[in-house]
UniProtKB/Swiss-Prot annotation, chain B:
PANTHER family: CHM, RAB ESCORT PROTEIN 1 (PTHR11787:SF4), RAB GDP-DISSOCIATION INHIBITOR (PTHR11787). It comes from Saccharomyces cerevisiae (strain ATCC 204508 / S288c). GO terms for cellular component: cytoplasm; cytosol; membrane; nucleus; Rab-protein geranylgeranyltransferase complex. InterPro entries: FAD/NAD-bd_sf, GDP_dissociation_inhibitor, Mrs6. Pfam families: GDI. It comes from the Eukaryota. Substrate-binding subunit (component A) of the Rab geranylgeranyltransferase (GGTase) complex. Binds unprenylated Rab proteins and presents the substrate peptide to the catalytic component B. The component A is thought to be regenerated by transferring its prenylated Rab back to the donor membrane. GO terms for biological process: endoplasmic reticulum to Golgi vesicle-mediated transport; protein targeting to membrane; small GTPase-mediated signal transduction; vesicle-mediated transport. This is Rab proteins geranylgeranyltransferase component A.
Length: 222, 603
């Protein structure tokens, strides 16, 4: 079946969530991925990253969204976390100014470790806490513009703008990737997430039952 | 006290867990279990296990303990993950070399570094490179691979195949004849040799059971055994021992060598026509980060830049350089490189591993199989100008592995030779590689017969008149551009082939009972430094032995099962069919579930 070959999607985007502890990254992830309307019932392919498949331009795009697993607490996120990410969301809590101030740190850590072409969104989460707001929307908007980031305020609690924030990012990545593929006259549309990176050798997938002589050179990286 | 029973894991302790499953054993981890914030509001003031150092063994151990249910605090004194297994950028290497030479990194000495100005201020940046301190390859059928799948850490990683194993002999690089088909079709092999090789391969897949064949040679060398018992000639003996077995010298004992040769053969064709895999973006450095992430998902707490100052075995309190303290209810596990000041129990690291890592500005794709970016070159004893007694291994990675940019290549050379000879051997191997490469790159001109002629012995001669310059001038112009050269000596307590011997940790156990007044490390257990072994084979064994010391038994070492789709839990456990494909491409073998492969000779 096509599933065995990992072709239940046309493109796979790895997206990482970063930001201080307690800003609601995990809730954003589960809010976005558990409200599924995708045909893929097996949306979770890891215990701490989850997927949702969207359709853009008739292409099935599988967004694989990674959470920090708590390693952000002491700023000990592994550099491997950023490998192959084509998108990132930097999340802060609108009711906690320190979490907004630390976005600078997260942005520079991202720039240091991720691919240069990574698409980045800034998310002010917990918009339902308007009465406790500590970070003015305008200020964040300016910061986002200065650093060429997408910007949305969301509430993982009442799900306001959650889909919008992820979809905007995924759309931006898609535009980047398709532009890149056009530039290259690229023909490989079969699921290599790293549309933006250098030509790679084929990757071996360890998950499928080995030894059926079927794929040794499958190009699906997950 | 140790509790031999299995404690509920972090995931099991969560209230949501039981709504997902009725049966707590084997552990089934529900979807998104790890993303529920598993951390307490403050730094834990009490943990079950403290681990210092985020190298391979420590990281596998941390993940195993976290999933078993232990509360783990995992720290590293560096600001990066990996410790002795780290994958570093060029800037990080520069700092590391300085620290080694200042004496602040124990277990390493004699670090010498050359970095071209092209890196940093020129066309390459420091982070274009990921240099492994102890590079490794992963055999397709190995204990680590099955743990990678079981723990799902493989999902954090990308792997590529490694099928080219070259043996350097008589000034040239022979590609390995390793499949039955290749043996059959190899025009250069005499019929008798083919027959003997096949006989040996048939034997080695199930060697343990055939004691009558190898037992008489148990205390003798592998080359005696292959020569006398299987009538194999030197080239085949060398290929088997050094390229397939990746052994270090001719004195290797028969059981060890058989084990290692079988490792290669049974790994072949498990995932495709290759025996080994390499991880992208770096080797052990990436894998250890994957296991650390897994441990974090399982509830472990991570801190970098955290240095252990002392552990008091009476109060069980560990103190860190930043003044913080934690009470450790069970064990403190420390990598030798992370030993606190005034430590007195660090095991002696008496064996040297000499390493030279080079980055060359040349794609050198000649070394690789099509579509691959990795190769292994082995220089057997006596093959080098230096008259080497020990093997020099060169592990080569190209840009496709994403550890270096397009147009460059990384050579990892290492030897188990001890003392000053080692550097001579490594230099000789480097020179041999350099010469071979220059020959290869000048052969690009071969099409123009007027410029390039082949001499009788295969060397290319360049028609200097045509080129408008003398031959002498031509050679320096073609000299290889080295972007980076790093030489260092690493020390380890693990001798070559000490991989599966768990008694190395008993040294540490004895130390637990000894109390030295004034020592900052009474009561701690030290892990081992990476050995010279080019495969990951020692890692799981070491982690398992340590796990057993902490938990009381290794029965539930990674005994977990993630709630999952229809995906089959591919275990790396011996599977008869894999033996079949290991050396056989045709259907002439009748397998009846036995590990014994009996290939029909069809000569």
């Amino acid at each position: 079946s096509s599933e065995d070959y990992g072709y239940d999607y046309d493109l796979l985007f790895k997206i990482v969530l970063i930001g201080d502890s307690g800003v609601g990254k995990s809730n954003l992830l589960s809010r976005f991925t558990k409200n599924e309307f995708n045909m893929d019932s097996k949306s979770t392919i890891g215990v701490e990253f989850a997927t949702r498949t969207l359709e853009i331009d008739g292409k099935r795009i599988k967004a694989q969204i990674w959470d920090t697993a708590g390693q952000e607490r002491y700023r000990a996120i592994t550099s491997a976390y950023y490998r192959g990410a084509v998108g990132a969301l930097i999340v802060y809590d609108i009711s906690k100014s320190s979490s907004y101030e630390n976005c600078n740190h997260w942005l520079s850590e991202l720039r240091e470790n991720a691919d240069d072409n990574v698409a980045v969104g800034l998310i002010g989460n917990k918009s339902d806490l308007a009465h406790l707001r500590a970070v003015p929307t305008e200020e964040s908007k300016t910061f986002a513009q200065e650093n060429q980031l997408l910007f949305t305020e969301t509430s993982a609690l009442n799900s306001e703008n959650v889909d919008k924030a992820f979809e905007e990012l995924i759309n931006t990545i898609y535009q980047k990737v398709s532009k890149h593929q056009m530039d290259l006259g690229d023909s490989s549309a079969n699921g290599n997430a790293n549309g933006a990176s250098a030509p790679n050798g084929p990757t071996i997938s360890l998950t499928p039952t080995p030894n059926e002589n079927k794929k040794a050179n499958g190009n699906n990286c997950c | 006290m140790l509790s031999p029973e299995r404690r509920p894991s972090m995931a099991e302790r969560r209230p949501s867990f039981f709504s997902f499953t009725q049966n707590p054993s084997p552990l089934v981890v529900p979807h998104l279990a790890g993303i529920e914030d598993p951390l307490p509001a403050t730094t834990p003031d009490k943990v079950d296990v403290l681990i210092a150092g985020t190298g391979m063994v420590e990281s596998v151990l941390a993940a195993a303990l976290a999933w078993q249910g232990s509360n783990v605090l995992h720290i590293d004194k560096n600001d990066y993950y990996g410790d002795t297994s780290a994958t570093l950028t060029v800037d990080q290497i520069k700092r590391w070399v300085n620290e080694v030479n200042e004496g602040s990194v124990s277990c390493y000495k004699n670090a010498k570094l050359y970095v071209s100005t092209l890196i940093g201020s020129g066309k390459y940046s420091s982070r274009d490179f990921g240099i492994d301190l102890s590079p490794k390859i992963l055999f397709a059928k190995s204990d680590l691979l099955s743990i990678l799948i079981k723990s799902r850490v493989h999902q954090y990683l990308e792997f590529q195949s490694l099928s080219n194993f070259h043996t350097y002999e008589n000034d040239c690089f022979e590609k390995l004849t390793n499949t039955k088909q290749e043996i059959f079709t190899d025009q250069n092999l005499p019929l008798m040799t083919k027959r003997n090789l096949m006989k040996f391969i048939k034997f080695v897949l199930n060697w343990e059971a055939q004691t009558e064949i190898w037992q008489p040679y148990a205390e003798r060398t592998m080359s005696d055994f292959l020569g006398e018992k299987f009538k194999l000639e030197k080239p085949q003996v060398f290929e088997l021992i050094f390229s397939i077995g990746l052994c270090y010298d001719l004195n290797v004992k028969v059981p060890e060598a058989l084990q290692r040769i079988r490792r290669y053969l049974t790994s072949f064709d498990v995932y495709g026509p290759f025996p080994a895999l390499c991880s992208k973006y770096g080797g052990p450095g990436e894998l250890s980060q994957g296991f650390c992430r897994s441990a974090a998902v399982g509830g472990a707490t991570y801190k970098l830049n955290e240095k252990l100052v002392s552990f008091n075995p009476t109060t069980k309190v560990a103190t860190f350089q930043d003044g913080s303290k934690v009470e450790v209810s069970e064990k403190v596990i420390i990598s030798p490189t992370q030993a606190p000041k005034d430590s007195k129990h660090v095991p002696q690291q008496q064996y040297q591993v000499h390493r030279l890592t080079c980055i060359v500005e040349n794609p050198c794709t000649e070394w690789f199989n099509e579509g691959e970016s990795a190769a292994m070159v082995v220089f057997p004893p006596g093959s080098l100008k230096s008259g080497n007694k020990e093997v020099v291994q060169a592990f080569i990675l190209g840009a496709g592995s994403e550890i270096c940019p397009e147009g460059t290549i990384v050579w990892y050379l290492s030897t188990t030779e001890q003392g000053p000879r080692a550097e001579m051997d490594i230099d000789a191997a480097l020179e041999a590689m350099e010469m071979a490469l220059l020959r290869e790159s000048s052969s690009g001109l071969e099409n123009d017969e007027e410029i390039v002629q082949l001499t009788g012995n295969g060397h290319t001669i360049v028609n200097s008149v045509k080129l408008g310059q003398s031959f002498k001038e031509y050679v320096p112009r073609e000299r290889l551009q080295f972007l980076f050269k790093l030489y260092y000596t690493q020390y380890t307590s693990t001798p070559p082939f000490g991989v599966v011997n768990s008694s190395f940790f008993d040294v540490n156990q004895d130390l637990e009972k000894k109390y030295i007044p004034g020592a900052s490390d009474n009561g701690v257990i030290y892990t081992t430094m990476p050995s010279a072994e080019i495969s990951y084979d020692e890692v799981v064994t070491a982690a398992k032995v340590l796990y057993e010391k902490i938990v009381g038994s290794d029965d539930d070492f990674f005994d977990l099962d993630f709630e999952d789709e229809d995906e089959i839990q591919a275990s790396g456990v011996a599977n008869a069919e894999q033996f079949e494909n290991a050396i056989d491409d045709d259907d002439d073998v009748n397998m009846e579930g036995s590990g014994e492969f009996v290939g029909e000779m069809e000569i």
